[in-house]
Amino acid sequence: MSAEIVLAVDGGNSKTDLALVGADGSLLALARGAQSSPHHLGVDGCLLVLERLLDEAVAEAGLARRNGRVAQVAKLMLAGVDFPAEEVALAERVRAEGWAAETSVANDTFAVLRAGTERGWGVAVVCGAGINCVGVAPDGRHARFPALGAITGDWGGGYDVGLAALSSAARSEDGRGPRTTLEGAVPHHFGLRTPTELAEAIHRRRIDVRRVVELAPLVFSEAEDDAVASEIVARLAAEIVALARAALIRLDLHQGPVEVLLGDRKSTRLNSSHRLRSRMPSSA
């Protein structure tokens, strides 16, 4: 049975999808769980999440595991696997688990590129909890970014957008910045009245600061009528374009037509508002 099955994983910083797929493309089982980024959970924590999801998928598909093996091929696309050495190390651990006869590991940005184009090349930008980009040329050359946050020049993931909203709300309240509807909307999201109350709750660890990622959709909603929220969205658009443009130039793909793919709802909403299309190179 394993010779006919592909184990596919799309693991992000907020959720993980694990699928068992037949050789004909039929979906045998799909399990969804928590984040599986080895950067945040460690390799052991990552494997624990995947093992649980695999057990669910195997049960759903009505399969039997023989010596741990489920599939002929395992393709794992995971956030937090940002360097080739990390891909190699995680792939070795997965092979040791014996889930499949053949195993490959890559960053989850490659999943967007593979899902969005049949050509197998182009540029993909993912804007989830963090932000990342990958470019692949027709000859197989890659353009990648470390995507480690501020230390590698990144801005624009859900955490950054949420933190910008929180900061703007606080500055609106105390007069240092322009007035914005975020002043009320941001604390209200957490059941509080003012940005100061929210800041104190975060400071005293009653609210985990990582929850600011929840504010990203709110920023888009407020941006329809609020100048400050709109500026945050515009900055995100500029960062996405900067990533895509850099990948295109590094691969010398800026002369002819190239598919540029956007992953996650935030970047998709940006594209639908034409903020991105007007800023992209003419080749994109």
Where do the protein language model's features map onto the residues?
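Phosphate-binding/catalytic loop of phosphoryl-transfer enzymes
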Residues: V81-R179
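Alpha-helical substrate-recognition element adjacent to the catalytic core
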Residues: G45-V49, G80-A85
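Glycine-rich beta-strand-to-loop/alpha-helix junction loops that act as flexible
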Residues: K75-V81, C127-A129, V258-S267
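Short, glycine/charge-rich beta-strand/loop segments that flank catalytic centers
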Residues: R69-M77, N107-V112
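ATP-binding/phosphotransfer module of carbohydrate and carboxylate kinases, centering on a glycine-rich
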Residues: M1-R66, V70-A71, R95, A115-W121, ...
